[in-house]
Swiss-Prot record:
It catalyses: chlorophyllide a + 2 NADPH + 2 O2 + 2 H(+) = chlorophyllide b + 2 NADP(+) + 3 H2O. Its main location: plastid. [2Fe-2S] cluster binds at C346, H348, C365, H368. GO terms for biological process: chlorophyll biosynthetic process. Keywords: 2Fe-2S, Chlorophyll biosynthesis, Chloroplast, Coiled coil, Iron, Iron-sulfur, Membrane, Metal-binding, NADP, Oxidoreductase, Plastid, Plastid inner membrane, Thylakoid, Transit peptide. This is Chlorophyllide a oxygenase, chloroplastic. Residues 259-271 have a biased composition (Polar residues). Its EC number is 1.14.13.122. Fe cation binds at E446, D450, H453, H458. It is a peripheral membrane protein. One of its GO terms (cellular component) is chloroplast inner membrane. Residues 105-218 form a coiled coil. Residues 305-406 form the Rieske domain.
Length: 645
């Protein structure tokens, strides 16, 4: 049986062929229809093996970029952004070199201005266009102008309704200002009227005074004429009577003018002259007693060893800048680990060396790379021929009892270092804190030597709950020490600027009364170093030691707690001492009326005021001749009556 396709072909051929004259009938039985066979591809598809994994497998792959949204963005610093940051750093450096602000204060203000990036870019354009030095004042001026320009732009964009509201607000403010101006004018008129009344009263009083003077002179003339009329027997008494008013008048003229007008009344006894010697002023009395305070730093204070820094705060390859007697210095350790101190000013262009770094025990200047050793000599000058005998000043430096000591005086320093800085036996150091205090160091020392103020000043810190005693007294002795009554506190002053105190504690945080420090079980030892940094500033080094609770040194972050407590106590004192300093600058005195419990501070002030004379006498080989110029070891031997006013 032929396939259906062949049957159709055969039928077509048979019907068209001319040779077939007769039609052949073929009878085909009914058969089931078969499905046509599948076509077999001639060439195999090379991608067919991939299509079995999916219709898109093996095609063009598109990577989804959604994962980039979760990737942290990395900020790329461009040249413009670096220039903006460089302007901030340059302004901080200029403020530090000028000494107008501390670097952290300038940086804080500049960082605040940089938060508004659009303003900061315009500030940079303004400073660059002006070709001015990048200082804080210049940047603040540029910021003000930028704010004005931006506000003008904002004003231009303001709607008419908003402008109308602003105009109404300004009108209300003008009306209020006019009312205040009218009130001020009325008060001024009242004050002028009162001034005129006072002038009239003063004129009346002046007339009365002149009239009384004429009356007194008339009475004197009458008395003299009466005595002269009695005869020569009373001539001597009349002469005495004449001399008495004359003497009084002469002394009255020489006496300094007072704020109130006083009237001299002549004695009725013309035979006895009146002693009218002028009394000394309180300022003269204070000067004679050595109690004259001043903001100036005596030159005689230079000839002492000063603990300038804690040893633990001066590791290797570290620069510690500080000021002493108004001069900049920087400390570091040399290649042997020994402390050194040189002037913080490069010998080349005056750049602060403390901005540089320590390279193999020598300080490298950050400006041109000059290097200086511990003696101040320049040892390296890159990019230029080396010049000898170039260097900076250096201070004698030593290390003892956990302190770095420097000698700022003239000539050779003392051979031995002080030995009182070490804590007493049985005590362990718990805290070492350095603070720059904006107070003259003498005022701060006097505050530390005064304990009578504690119940009134430190009511929120260590003296909380202390009752006010009936009396407070300091008992001094000749060993540069003494103790307070009724508090269990031993206190001492060590020249030139150190105070030591040992406090007896009943239990941690509480103090006992009516006993001495030696009678207490637990003790707290304090050392305050008040180094004269510059005029009106003190570099304060504070060390605290305890003879109990040794495990407390290992408590995490305990140093932060001690710093916070010390800052709180110092803040309570600082408000008062700054007020004293302000009154001193205005001509006032903090030694008008000393009290008995001021004994220790009084003797410090006497020693301080006589230190120049003391140094001069010691250089001349003479011993001290009076308590004002007495040495440190003798200043506690003055009697109790030196506190009398």
């Amino acid at each position: 049986m032929l396939p259906a396709s062949l049957q159709r072909k055969a039928a077509a051929v048979g019907g068209r062929g001319p040779t077939n004259q007769s039609r052949v009938a073929v009878r085909v039985s009914a058969q089931p229809k078969e499905a046509p066979p599948a076509s077999t591809p001639i060439v195999e598809d090379p991608e067919s093996k991939f299509r079995r994994y999916g219709k898109h497998f093996g095609g063009i792959h598109k990577l989804s970029m959604d994962w980039l949204d979760s990737v942290p963005r990395v900020r790329v610093r461009t040249k413009d952004s670096r220039q903006l940051d460089d302007m901030l750093e340059l302004a901080v450096l200029n403020e530090r070199l000028a000494g107008r602000l501390e670097p952290w204060q300038a940086r804080q203000k500049l960082e605040y201005l940089r938060k508004r990036r659009k303003n900061w870019e315009r500030i940079f354009e303004y400073v660059t266009r002006q070709d001015a030095a990048a200082t804080l004042a210049m940047i603040e001026e540029a910021n003000r102008k930028v704010e004005e320009s931006l506000s003008e732009e904002a004003r231009e964009k303001t709607a008419v309704g908003d402008l109308r509201d602003q105009l109404e607000s300004l009108r209300a403010q003008v009306a209020q200002a006019q009312e205040r101006l009218a009130m001020t004018q009325s008060r001024v008129e009242q004050n002028l009227q009162r001034v005129n009344e006072l002038k009239a009263e003063a004129t009346t009083l002046e007339r009365m005074r002149k009239a009384s003077d004429l009356d007194i002179k008339e009475r004197e003339r009458i008395a003299i004429s009466t005595v002269a009329a009695k005869g020569p027997a009373s001539s001597s008494s009349s002469a005495a009577a004449v001399s008495a008013p004359a003497t009084s008048a002469t002394l009255t003229v020489e006496r300094p003018a007072a704020t109130t007008v006083t009237q001299e009344v002549p004695s009725t006894s013309y035979g006895t002259p009146v002693d009218r010697a002028p009394r000394r002023s309180k300022a003269a009395i204070r000067r004679s007693r050595g109690l004259e305070s001043s903001m100036e730093i005596e030159e005689g204070l230079r000839n002492f060893w000063y603990p300038a820094e804690f040893s633990a705060r001066l590791p290797k390859d570290t620069l510690v800048p500080f000021e002493l007697f108004g001069e900049p210095w920087v400390m570091f350790r040399d290649e042997k680990g020994q402390p050194s101190c040189i002037r913080d000013e490069c010998a080349h262009r005056g750049c602060p060396l403390s901005l540089g770094k320590v390279v193999e025990g020598q300080v490298m200047c950050p400006y041109h790379g000059w290097e200086f050793n511990g003696d101040g000599a320049c040892t390296k000058m890159p990019s230029t021929p080396f010049c000898r005998n170039v260097g900076v000043a250096a201070l004698p430096c030593a290390e003892k009892d956990g302190f770095i000591w420097v000698w700022p005086g003239d000539g050779l320093p003392a051979e031995t270092l002080p030995d009182f800085a070490q804590p007493p036996e049985g005590f362990l150091i718990h805290a070492e804190i350095m603070v720059d205090v904006p107070v003259e160091h003498g005022l701060l020392i006097e505050n530390l030597l005064d304990l009578a103020h504690a119940p009134f000043t430190h009511t929120s810190t260590f003296a909380r709950g202390w009752p006010v005693p009936d009396f407070v007294k300091f008992h001094a002795n000749k060993a540069l020490s003494g103790f307070w009554d009724p508090y269990p506190i031993d206190m001492a002053f060590q020249p030139p600027c150190m105070t030591l105190s040992t406090i007896g504690l009943a239990q941690p945080g509480k103090i006992m009364r009516g006993v001495t420090a030696s009678q207490c079980k637990n003790h707290l030892h304090q050392l305050h170093v008040c180094m004269p940094s510059k005029k009106g500033h003190t570099r304060l080094l504070y060390r605290m030691s305890l003879d109990f609770l040794p495990w407390m040194r290992h408590v995490p972050f305990i140093d932060r707690i001690w710093k916070q407590v010390a800052a709180q106590v110092l803040g309570e004192d600082l408000v008062l001492v700054l007020g004293q300093q302000d009154r001193m600058l205005r001509g006032g005195s903090n030694w008008s009326n000393p009290a008995p419990y001021d004994k220790l501070a009084v003797r410090y002030r006497r020693w301080r005021n006589g230190v120049n004379a003391e140094v001069a006498r010691v250089r001349a080989g003479e011993p001290p001749s009076n308590p004002v110029a007495m040495s440190a070891g003798e200043m506690f031997s003055v009697d109790e009556d030196d506190m009398d006013n």
